[in-house]
Design a protein with these regions (language model features):
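Acidic/hydrophobic-patterned starts of short beta strands in beta-sheet-rich repeat architectures
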Residues: 91-101, 156-169, 252-259
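Acidic, small-residue rich beta-repeat scaffolds with periodic aromatic anchors
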Residues: 49-75, 173-289
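Short N-terminal edge-element motif at the start of the domain
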Residues: 95-156
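Short, conserved, GDST-rich strand-edge loop motifs in beta-rich repeat architectures
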Residues: 102-107, 168-178
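Bacterial N-terminal signal peptides that target proteins for export
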Residues: 23-36
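Structural signature of eukaryotic scaffold interfaces centered on beta-propeller domains
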Residues: 83-92, 146-158, 244-253
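Solvent-exposed N-terminal domain segments of exported/luminal and surface proteins
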Residues: 52-109
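N-terminal signal peptide c-region/cleavage motif recognized by signal peptidases
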Residues: 44-46
Length: 289
């Protein structure tokens, strides 16, 4: 995902065993590559790689402040992200942004994003505002989650800059592998933090069974195990899409229109436009084509 300010922009048996092991290894390598690709897609454009705080003590202190007197059960917190926010309202002093991914045992297809704006002094963090209304899709289930603050200056108006929370999830089973990336944008104004837009940024699915059938079919045609082209079979059984976020110079109700389009040549000229309705972008969510 990227952001810009533009309008358009041995024997047969032992051989078979080795071949089977090689295939399993390729599948594992491919799945790991899928996870890595998702993470790289999420971080490629972001300043958060260096700004996100990874120190557990600081994360837990910020999480405790965010939770306040109504905390979520500890086993429901599936991820925490914390970062300084240099582009927040200057009148508020040095700011920090924090997010927690919360999923209770009764929830399976989505999870809550608890997000807050903090200040910090010699006594620790202090909560200025928080929101618990945003949810992210975790279907088919939350498996390997990734959470980070995105503090690129998302300038939604001439005077106001939003910040983002990046969520990633990779689910792997014996049959398939699914990866999802979602960006949620927030504004902090008048003592309140509010989600203003959410977009699917990265999505992929890999059909392992289909790839295995493809390799077996190719082996049969060639009459010699190992002559198949696994990369080709992997590609044929992988579906993925990535979206690019940008802002148009055109404004609606004093805020820049937001554009989302598929990444790459396939997305040239195709974009979905979102306009400001006074409080958020409308429609509020982009879930893909």
């Amino acid at each position: 995902m990227s952001i810009g300010m533009q309008e358009a922009r041995g024997d047969d048996l032992s051989f078979g065993r080795r071949d089977s092991r090689a295939r399993r290894s390729r599948k594992l390598d491919f799945c790991m590559q899928t996870v890595l690709t998702l993470v790289l897609a999420l971080v490629a454009h972001c300043a958060f790689a260096s700004s996100n705080v990874t120190d557990d003590e600081q994360q837990q202190a910020a999480l405790h402040t965010l939770m306040g007197t109504d905390p979520a059960p500890a086993d429901s917190v599936k991820g925490v992200a914390l970062s300084p926010w240099a582009h927040g309202p200057s009148a508020s002093g040095p700011l920090w942004v924090v997010a927690a991914l919360v999923q209770r045992p009764t929830e399976t297809v989505d999870a809550e994003l608890w997000t807050g704006v903090l200040t910090r002094d010699g006594h620790g963090f202090r909560l200025l505002a928080s929101d618990r209304s945003e949810r992210v899709d975790t279907s088919p289930m939350l498996w390997s989650a990734f959470l980070a603050m995105d503090v690129i200056p998302y300038r939604i108006s001439a005077q106001e800059t939003a910040f983002g929370v990046l969520f990633g999830n990779n689910y792997t089973s014996t049959a398939h592998s699914d990866s999802t990336g979602i960006l949620s944008l927030y504004r902090y104004r008048d003592g309140r933090v509010t989600p203003v837009f959410s977009a699917l940024t990265d999505w992929s699915t890999y059909d392992k069974d289909g790839a295995a059938e493809c390799e077996e079919k190719n082996d049969g045609k060639r009459g010699k195990p190992g002559d198949a082209r696994p990369d080709s079979c992997d590609a044929e059984n992988t579906t993925e899409t990535h979206y690019v976020l940008s802002f148009s110079p055109h404004m609606t109700n004093g805020h820049y229109d937001l554009l989302v389009r598929p990444k790459g040549k396939a997305g040239a000229g195709k974009s979905a436009r979102f306009t400001w309705n006074g409080n958020t972008y409308q429609p509020r969510r982009f879930t893909g084509d």
